[in-house]
Curated annotation (Swiss-Prot):
It comes from the Bacteria. It is an enzyme of class 2 (transferase). It is found in: Cytoplasm. The gene is adk. Residues 126-163 are annotated as: LID. This is Adenylate kinase. Its EC number is 2.7.4.3. GO terms for molecular function: adenylate kinase activity; ATP binding; zinc ion binding. Belongs to the adenylate kinase family. It catalyses: AMP + ATP = 2 ADP. The keyword DNA-binding does not apply. ATP binds at G10, A11, G12, K13, G14, T15, R127, V136, Y137, G199. Transmembrane segments: none annotated. Monomer.
Length: 214
């Protein structure tokens, strides 16, 4: 099964992708993880990604497409896979369709997780991370025992630049402009299902499985 997960930043796509990956036994492919890998290794792509994300922007199609093509060449995707964070534009969707056709494959379902904008801003702007160990907290949903400091190593927590409210809203605007047309693209092909993205992860998973006939 090949699934595409759509939705704004903070919609819970990553959480659902991990749960679905476990349920279906297929890999979760996150463009965010691929971007972070390139940044950590200091590649030229990684440097470009860092500059764009620090400004709250979206990474260009050519960079993203190249990383996705490489990832889909690996043998673990043979039984299927879940794409989280890609495609973001109709252009990327067209590229993906062509890539899958060349492999004799096609997507089964595009799932669009629907979440109100202010809830997205609250979810993302409340995130805090430890620069030393990478632990992630949330000021209201998952706070550290000592406010502002990591439970593991007592390092002062930081808010990522692209998690600040003004940058979250900017990303939402870009999402609406570039990514919303994807819903029309997949709906016109009869491949789109909307999923309510408000609730517990387990509850949303149950709805998702029902949509998939599982």
């Amino acid at each position: 099964m090949i699934l595409i997960l759509l939705g704004p930043p903070g919609a819970g796509k990553g959480t659902q992708a991990k749960l679905l990956s476990s349920e279906l036994g297929i890999p979760h492919i996150s463009t965010g993880d691929m971007f972070r890998d390139h940044k950590a290794r200091g590649t030229e792509i990684g440097k470009q990604v860092q500059a764009i994300m620090d400004a709250g922007g979206l990474v260009t199609d050519d960079i993203t497409n190249a990383m996705v093509k490489e990832r889909l060449s690996r043998p673990d995707v043979a039984p299927g896979f879940i794409l989280d964070g890609y495609p973001r534009t109709v252009v990327q969707a067209g590229y993906l369709d062509g890539l899958l056709r060349s492999l004799g494959r096609s997507i089964d379902r595009a799932l669009s997780y629907e979440v109100p904008e202010e809830l997205v801003v609250e979810r993302i702007s409340g995130r805090r991370s430890c620069p030393r160990c990478g632990a992630v907290y949330h000021v209201s949903q998952n706070p550290p025992h000592r406010a502002g400091f990591c439970d593991r190593d007592d390092t002062a927590l930081v808010q990522r630049e692209d998690d600040k409210p003004e940058n979250v809203r900017k990303r939402m605007q870009e999402y609406g402009t570039k990514t919303e047309p994807l819903k029309r693209y997949y709906r016109d092909r009869g491949e789109l299902s909307d999923v309510e993205g408000v609730g517990t992860p387990e509850g949303i998973l149950a709805v998702t499985k029902k949509v998939l006939g599982r």
